[in-house]
Amino acid sequence: MSQNSNLMREVRLFENHSEREQMENLSELFAVLNALEHLEKMFSRDHVTADEYKTECFKLIDQYKVTMRLVHGATSIEEFAKKYRLHCPAAIERIREGRPITVKDDQGNVLKHIASIVEQFITFLDSLRLNTRAVDDLYPVLDDLYNAINSTSRVPIDANVTTKVKKWHDRLSSMAATDEISDDEARQMIFDTEGAYQSFQKALNEQKH
């Protein structure tokens, strides 16, 4: 009977919370690489459209970057794949390049887009500081900033940036062109926009390292 009890005993894969988190992170990394490998194969066989492939590929590459930071002891993707016997040459190649195969290395365009977003932030903040309060003057400037932020997946946009800009974009779009914002609203708008701008700059700096 005791022998049967030993056979039925639960096998523990970890001894504490830290080991459990490591196991979950390893599983997540394995799943992301496996999914990326399958995505590459599906695209090569025309099972997904170019747009679907591009969107999903960027998403998986971002998930890989986040998960890889959480895994302790994994020095490279090649080492991880070898250690856990994961055959994923296409996924490894995609991660090395850092972009879908359909996207060319347009670093120059990315830098131009970043410069455009920075310019839109500064222009909008300057308008507020110069006491511009009319909706028909503020909204076009904020709309340019909002569209610039949402027009690319190649530029790192923190959720905090999108949320704060969208908040005021929605607010102004619901007002009449002849309306004006109050000084209190302008003050809060400056505070939120500066916070969004700082988050944007922080995300850019983190991407460089």
UniProtKB/Swiss-Prot annotation:
InterPro entries: ESCRT_assembly_dom, Vps28, VPS28_C, VPS28_C_sf, VPS28_N, VPS28_N_sf. Residues 109-205 form the VPS28 C-terminal domain. The keyword Transit peptide does not apply. Its main location: other. It holds the Pfam family VPS28. Keywords: Endosome, Protein transport, Transport. PROSITE patterns: VPS28_C (PS51310), VPS28_N (PS51313). GO terms for biological process: protein transport to vacuole involved in ubiquitin-dependent protein catabolic process via the multivesicular body sorting pathway; receptor catabolic process. It is found in: Endosome. Residues 1-105 form the VPS28 N-terminal domain. It comes from the Eukaryota. One of its GO terms (cellular component) is ESCRT I complex. GO terms for molecular function: protein-containing complex binding. The keyword Ribonucleoprotein does not apply. Belongs to the VPS28 family. Component of the ESCRT-I complex (endosomal sorting complex required for transport I). Component of the ESCRT-I complex, a regulator of vesicular trafficking process. This is Vacuolar protein sorting-associated protein 28 homolog. It comes from Caenorhabditis briggsae.
